[in-house]
């Protein structure tokens, strides 16, 4: 088979004046357009953002392993399928082991 990935640099520019750079949102759109129904196919959508993209870029140090750069994005989701289906926002991200962003989860307030 052919290795495929999902990505874009067309965000908030003259050609595409919309978007938020969310690869999870792009994978969800891809799944909707292709009418993806099965969890295995949703997991493939997630793989197109992660290991399939790394393979296309020929990244030898991709993945969580001793000695690798520790690049990771953390989602509040039980599975990759849930992250795609529910368009979950990242809670934190790390580049070379250093935290680069954090998003606090929403908090419901009591009515006054």
Region roles according to the model:
Residues 1-75:
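His/Asp/Glu-enriched, well-ordered alpha-helical/loop segment
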Residues 55, 66-112:
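C-terminal cap of metal-dependent C-N hydrolases
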């Amino acid at each position: 088979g052919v290795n495929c990935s999902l990505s874009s640099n067309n965000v908030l520019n003259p050609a595409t004046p919309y978007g938020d750079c969310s690869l999870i949102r792009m994978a969800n759109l891809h799944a909707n357009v292709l009418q993806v129904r099965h969890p295995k196919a949703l997991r493939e959508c997630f793989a197109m953002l992660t290991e399939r993209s790394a393979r296309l870029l020929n990244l030898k140090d991709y993945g969580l392993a001793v000695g690798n750069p520790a690049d990771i994005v953390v989602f509040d989701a039980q599975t990759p399928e849930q992250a795609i289906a529910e368009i979950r926002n990242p809670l934190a991200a790390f580049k070379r082991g250093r935290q680069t962003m954090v998003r606090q989860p929403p908090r419901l307030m009591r009515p006054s």
